[in-house]
Regions:
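Gly-rich Lys/Arg/Thr-decorated short loops/hinges at beta-loop-alpha junctions or inter-strand turns
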Residues: 6, 32, 70-79, 147-149
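A conserved beta-strand/loop capping segment in the N-terminal third of enzymes
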Residues: 39-77, 212
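Short amphipathic alpha-helical patches
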Residues: 32-33, 48-49, 75-76, 167, ...
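Short coil/turn segments at secondary-structure junctions
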Residues: 29-36, 78-82, 151, 155, ...
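Residues forming the flavin
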Residues: 1-23, 61-63, 84-226
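Redox-cofactor-proximal catalytic regions of oxidoreductases
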Residues: 1-57
């Protein structure tokens, strides 16, 4: 679902903005965020963005050639670098193209993880199934689970239906400790449709630029940050 991200990526433009950036982030998380994690995210943002730019990610610039910063949701200042309205696709495509060229990376497409291969309480690989229903295995010394969230389990979601939290289920099955799985990010604004399936995402940038949520009577019905 990284491909679907529209708005952009936050970055600390200036050290003088740290306090405001930190407060905006904590407020948006109802002050339940891990403060240390928020600090690391903000402090490392310039380095991360710099790396993405060096790798070829094309963030939008203004007529003077300077980066064009926009604003999202709870941010009081413009801190968002973006690529048109498809920032996630730009970043994902760029990184994927690089990964495909790496000799030490093997990409196995259209393959689903079915289970862990466990021996003596150590994960040694995974059982997988390809698009033709053929079962196989992939062995590895270390396993990193990066299968995304579980938004596809919900009736109304901007996630694709196959985003079902498979890694969480397998982790629980094999006794792997999980943390904070009660925090599920649901994108709050989508284009209304009577059709079943994934909803079209309306970016937080819309609210960042001043849009508000109204009911059918044209009345505000919520504080977007509550």
């Amino acid at each position: 679902d990284s491909m679907l991200a529209q708005g952009g990526v936050c970055v600390l433009k200036d050290v003088n903005d740290f306090k405001c950036y930190f407060e905006d982030t904590m407020k948006a998380g109802h002050w339940e965020n891990d403060p240390d994690s928020v600090r690391v995210m903000i402090e490392s943002s310039q380095e991360v963005i710099g790396t993405l730019i060096d790798l070829g990610v094309d963030f939008d610039t203004d007529k003077d050639g300077k980066y064009d910063y926009t604003r999202e949701g709870a941010h009081r200042r413009n801190r968002i670098l973006h690529h048109k309205d498809e920032t996630g696709k730009e970043i994902t495509d760029t990184l994927l193209d690089i990964a495909k060229k790496k000799e030490n990376i093997t990409i196995v497409p259209k393959t689903t993880m079915i289970d862990f291969i466990e021996k003596d309480n150590v994960c040694q690989g995974i059982v997988c199934e390809d698009e033709y229903g053929e079962m196989g295995s992939i062995l590895a010394r270390d396993i990193i689970l990066a299968t995304g969230g579980l938004g596809g389990l919900f009736l109304n979601s901007t996630n694709y239906p196959h985003i079902t939290g498979d890694s969480f289920a397998l982790a629980i099955k094999h006794g792997v400790e999980l943390k904070d799985i009660n925090y599920i990010q649901i994108h709050p604004t989508t284009l209304y449709s009577k059709k079943k399936g994934r909803r079209f995402l309306i970016s937080e940038s819309v609210r960042g630029e001043g849009a508000i949520l109204l009911n059918e009577n044209g009345e505000r019905f919520t504080d977007e940050l509550q």
